[in-house]
Amino acid sequence: MVYSYTEKKRIRKDFGTRPQVLDIPYLLSIQLDSFDKFIEQDPEGQYGLEAAFRSVFPIQSYNGNSELQYVSYRLGEPVFDVKECQIRGVTYSKPLRVKLRLVIFDKDAPAGTVKDIKEQEVYMGEIPLMTDNGTFVINGTERVIVSQLHRSPGVFFDSDKGKTHSSGKVLYNARVIPYRGSWLDFEFDPKDNLYVRIDRRRKLPASIILRALGKTSEEILDIFFEKVNFEVKDQTLLMELVPDRLRGETASFDIEANGKTYVEQGRRVTARHIRQLEKDGVDHIEVPVEYIVGKVASKDYINEATGEIIVNANQEISLEALANLSQAGHKSLETLFTNDLDHGPFMSETLRIDSTVDRISALVEIYRMMRPGEPPTKEAAEALFESLFFSEERYDLSTVGRMKFNSSIGREDAQEQGTLDELDIVEVMKKLIAIRNGKGEVDDIDHLGNRRIRSVGEMAENQFRVGLVRVERAVKERLSLGDLDAIMPQDLINAKPISAAVKEFFGSSQLSQFMDQNNPLSEVTHKRRISALGPGGLTRERAGFEVRDVHVTHYGRLCPIETPEGPNIGLINSLSAFARCNEYGFLETPYRRVVDGVVTDEVDYLSAIEEGQFVIAQANAALTEEGGFADELITARQKGESGLHPREHAQYMDVATNQVVSIAASLIPFLEHDDANRALMGANMQRQAVPTLKADKPLVGTGIERNVAVDSGVTAVAKRGGVIQSVDASRIVVKVNEEELVPGEAGIDIYNLTKYTRSNQNTCINQRPCVMPGEPVSRGDVLADGPSTDLGELALGQNMRIAFMPWNGYNFEDSILVSERVVQEDRFTTIHIQELTCVARDTKLGSEEITADIPNVGESALSKLDESGIVYIGAEVKGGDILVGKVTPKGETQLTPEEKLLRAIFGEKASDVKDTSLRVPNSVSGTIIDVQVFTRDGVEKDKRALEIEQMQLKEAKKDLTEEFQILEGGLLNRVRAVLIDGGYSEAKLDTTDRKKWLELTLEDDALQTQLEQLAEQWDELKADFDKKFETKRRKITQGDDLAPGVLKIVKVYLAVKRRIQPGDKMAGRHGNKGVISKINPVEDMPYDEKGQPVDIVLNPLGVPSRMNIGQILEVHLGLAAKGIGDKINQMVKEQQELAKFREFLQKVYDLGETRQKVDIASLSDDEVRTLIKNLRGGLPIATPVFDGAPEASIKALLKLADLPESGQLKLFDGRTGDQFERPVTVGYMYMLKLNHLVDDKMHARSTGSYSLVTQQPLGGKAQFGGQRFGEMEVWALEAYGAAYTLQEMLTVKSDDVNGRTKMYKNIVDGNHSMEPGMPESFNVLLKEIRSLGINIELEDEE
């Protein structure tokens, strides 16, 4: 196996046995690909902005004299880069410029003669841009657009499963769902009539829609029924016989022909009878005249002599009608063939309840239903019906919808047609009737073949189209009004509606969410989230159990484990590890192809629909050397059902064991031993882990930690291979390999690192280099670790030494006992960064001022401010300290005589301003790490702002100069090489000034040309540097674009260091969560025979009932991993030679049956030394989900580390030194500190705010609220008989307003008594009763 440079530094021992056929695809591709499709210029006009423009343009004026045509669009360059946008609080976007052509036709000349053409580029607003990591910066905050799982457009056949009608009869319905436009529903009622609804309005008989399409009753019957022909012969009737139609009927007369009786009267017609009739070739039989009575005529029969109708189409035939027919000379008669079994008379019955007679009356009926109360005219009715389903502006099935529609009704043509046609409607009705007749199946709407993914690009395109349509209306009106000769395209287009639509979508759509930025995993998971909620989706209240449940088609597409607990369960899902979207938006998952019983490495992506046709073997099926299946019978899936199949039947095989689950779930080692409910909690809690101060890779992982860390974008990854030229805390410089160079560039890559910035969740984002100068790196190598990453691997928590045992009740009910050593070593210390903002506005009374001159504030309070009134960087502040001094003018008030005196003595200034400074919130203390001042254009900058500006300019200049020097150095080195080739000596060059090298000349023409090219490049480089610096300078010095009325904004960043303490929530990766109950001194913790104390004591009772046994296996394997590290440490202490280390490492990596082949011999001595250094803390292990380390391997590893195979050690009580009576399970578990910190939750209330209506105290920390004394607490006091306590709880301590004030007075006066009055909420109750019209009054007892 080939390891990259960073991977060699610490090789994970992999226990997986299945070969890796397919690497996990790039995790953010669902976001990036979708948005690229939206922005990229698509020549076909199928997707993105191009499609939106083409669907709206050309816009014609109402009078047809002119039209506005779309030519092309281009996106400009963003003004600020991503970081600047975040700092300034603006949106990261590109301007959209569209080239439009206004064509004016000549009124007087023949139609289509062009009079004038004007082209112009028009600005159409800003399009937010996706960053490289799949997020958007909107108003300075990072947001993610979550993909939506919605019902695919197309036609769906469904039934109510007998729930609608009391009889329990199953009613079938069909629904045509377009991508945009009106819904069309067909449904049966309990009397078996077929109805149609448009847009879920009131129902009409379904024949109305056929009539509206111009069909007569005869044609309608012709479409839906088979016919039976009767010939009238004297007194008998000859019936045309189709033997198959008789099957299952009871003969009501003897069936005989040619003198032979086939079926006697009263007998049932069987398959044997039918065979005999077919064999004898009987095609007509005689039937009694009574047989035809009650049959239904299929067409109109007319007496040609008189012209009157004898029998109407769809009319039942009576004996009288029969007589009239023979009299009129009709020799044959055609009736509808119906029976109760599989040819129901549904359409015939429906026509009877249909009151309309022709096309116009049908159209009018539809118009009345859609626009009740409006007088229908023929034209209006026709126009409405036409626009419902047949106009491209109003109705679009979309490519997906047409594809689904055609495959459902079995139509081959009309691939591109977005609207419906007559055939579509007829076919849907036919299929629905066939289903009612018992042929065919209803669809399963939870099948992933009927639900598709709508990603960012598609939703943005839809919003953009909405904006364009709004513009279209305005353009049409303007084209019709104005003087066209003077108008340019610019004057027609108002970009506001477009900007507004796009802004609304990115800023406030339900699916545009504030990015969960706790740690890299939460970012990745958020971007891979699939929600069924949102516009055009479900609502929590309406979603039933079926939609939320795991469906068989989720296999390998959506994770069956990771979903929120609570009201959204099952509605928000996560994409499985290998899943991807196909061009239609359906989810696909990869499978290995099986050819002639041999599993190949060819991979096919199958959607849920395609998968149904195949037999698919599981990923853990045993294979032979040749790649065939080892067992005769294998577990496989077919049509979603798992079962045993002969191995010859398998057509595909899963690609990996973690194919089924999401990224978060595949990070849980030994997932296969955990109960699903706990695994769900484990997957969800990893996303809440706070990045610790020192990241620590998990000893027991699953092998995909590197994928998550690299794909999340929090690490710095090498874009091209090369050698590290220099490294410092804020930048890494790589000299690129020759073969990866683009001709004519300097060949230097510079990576600027992010230092101590704030994330959305107030955690700290900081990158640390993990490479040294001179190290070779290749493309994709990790150069710097971000938050929660360690040597390029995801590291959410810390490896803790754990014992499972009770300890004096301190770990009762999931509490956690932690050793003081954990706090001392800062294992779970986290940095949180808060942003506090102070805004100076223009008020009616004058403008607010940021100043250090604040009235009535002592010197000590101002000690941390500079002369501008802004706190200096590095100050340690605590709750209540002033960060930014600000004064606000206050209105003139009535002055007291004392104040007047003060004014007279001290002049005017004493009290016309009030102190509105920004102070540190009460519960916070920390260090100021950054201050930013934004000043409105045209307002003079204060001293601090200018200082910051100078500093930024200096930094920018330093950065760019360094960058320039590095690039220049690279270029001059190449110049030097050319000059030496041309015959100059090294010594001469070293004495010449390097800048002068470019002026030297060479004999050789080729080399001279090269030298001249390099000189040109140097000039370009210099010009580029000047231009870049100028741009940077302009950005830094220009005023800021602030909201109206805002003069100045000061942002102060405060870093808080939080150590772990009782009340903080911690968890493992298996859903085993708990709260710290006590921090115990190290000397009191249990310790083993070597004197090593444990870090954490967990309660063993937390394991059996929760069935998450994975944690026990993790602890055992962690112990072995740490044991190997200890053994390496021992060897280092003994200073053994390198060969011994190589031998031991080879032994470790070869242990167990694994797919991983690590060849220690192929590593250089330096690489082995680095590896040893990194393994001293323990051997990192990968145990992939569903393919983890078996028990035997764990025991073998424990044995190799000289530890007991049981994984249990003798422990001693730290307080007494006595041995505990049984061995205890001790080992290493990866523990996370979750973002539920006691510091953020702790809260106490004194007198505070009250609710307006009930006058009760508010609740919650944010409102400085109280604790609710609820009904159960009231019952408790009632049960104790504590009447007076109860009285004060319900009155003076809650909502008795007068009582409250009196009590305060009494306490001040030293009189400790209370007089409870009427609680305000009782008055509210009285008012509510009165509002119901019941007069209720309180009467005093006399």
From Swiss-Prot:
Reactions that this protein is recorded to catalyse: RNA(n) + a ribonucleoside 5'-triphosphate = RNA(n+1) + diphosphate
Annotated Pfam families: RNA_pol_Rpb2_1, RNA_pol_Rpb2_2, RNA_pol_Rpb2_3, RNA_pol_Rpb2_45, RNA_pol_Rpb2_6, RNA_pol_Rpb2_7
Keywords: DNA-directed RNA polymerase, Nucleotidyltransferase, Transcription, Transferase
EC number annotated for this UniProt entry: 2.7.7.6
GO-annotated cellular components: DNA-directed RNA polymerase complex
Classification via SUPFAM superfamilies: beta and beta-prime subunits of DNA dependent RNA-polymerase (SSF64484)
GO function terms (MF aspect): DNA binding; DNA-directed RNA polymerase activity; ribonucleoside binding
Record has Nucleotidyltransferase as a keyword: yes
PROSITE patterns from the UniProt entry: RNA_POL_BETA
Superkingdom assignment: Bacteria
InterPro entries: DNA-dir_RNA_pol_bsu_ext_1_sf, DNA-dir_RNA_pol_bsu_external_1, DNA-dir_RNA_pol_su2, DNA-dir_RNAP_su2_dom, DNA-dir_RNAP_su2_hyb_sf, RNA_pol_bsu_bac, RNA_pol_bsu_CS, RNA_pol_bsu_protrusion
BP GO annotations: DNA-templated transcription
Cited HAMAP family: RNApol_bact_RpoB (MF_01321)
Protein's job: DNA-dependent RNA polymerase catalyzes the transcription of DNA into RNA using the four ribonucleoside triphosphates as substrates.
Family: Belongs to the RNA polymerase beta chain family.
Quaternary assembly: The RNAP catalytic core consists of 2 alpha, 1 beta, 1 beta' and 1 omega subunit. When a sigma factor is associated with the core the holoenzyme is formed, which can initiate transcription.
Protein name: DNA-directed RNA polymerase subunit beta
